[in-house]
Design a protein with these regions (language model features):
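Short N-terminal micro-motifs specific to bacterial/archaeal maturation
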Residues: 3, 18, 48-49, 121
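Short glycine/serine/threonine-biased micro-segments
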Residues: 20, 52, 98
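Hydrophobic pocket/interface hotspot
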Residues: 12-15, 27-28, 35, 54, ...
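Hydrophobic alpha-helical core bundles mediating ligand binding, dimerization, or RNAP-core interactions
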Residues: 12, 16-19, 31, 39, ...
Length: 135
């Protein structure tokens, strides 16, 4: 097992593990109060697309995912960091609860840190696949 020495990568891994366990308090524990969180996409094809400002708004992002899709796969396949940022590549697939359609893709997550906490998040995915799964 590899020992993580980069505190930023360890925080992102903690967030992913907390998400996987349904532990919202664990997710929020690594976020700055004024976190700037957004899932960027062309249009509004998924309920979680858009901006969430501040730690109190972030749970709505996860609720939008959890109530609309069943996650079939969520695998962090790569993490890299520099002085302020972590970039993650994630493989995920999901089935839309209302349509029964499935999408599978790689996502990119960009995490920026300030004072040891996640202050900025941008996520991108194959929005064409996501929109098709919701239609």
């Amino acid at each position: 097992m590899t020992t993580i020495t980069d505190a930023k990568i360890a925080s992102v891994q903690h967030l992913y593990a907390s998400f996987g366990a349904g532990d919202m308090a664990g997710v929020l524990s690594v976020l700055a109060d004024g976190v700037d969180w957004a899932a960027e996409a062309a249009g509004d094809g998924a309920p979680w697309y858009g901006s969430y400002r501040g730690i109190q708004a972030v749970p709505a992002f996860f609720e939008a995912i959890g109530t609309n899709v069943t996650i079939n796969e969520f695998d962090v396949v790569g993490l890299t960091s520099n002085d302020t940022d972590v970039v993650a590549t994630v493989r995920w697939s999901f089935t839309v609860n209302k349509t029964g359609k499935t999408a599978a893709m790689y996502m990119q997550h960009w995490w920026r840190f300030a004072d040891g906490k996640i202050a900025f998040f941008r996520g991108s995915e194959d929005s064409a696949q996501t929109v098709a799964a919701f239609s």
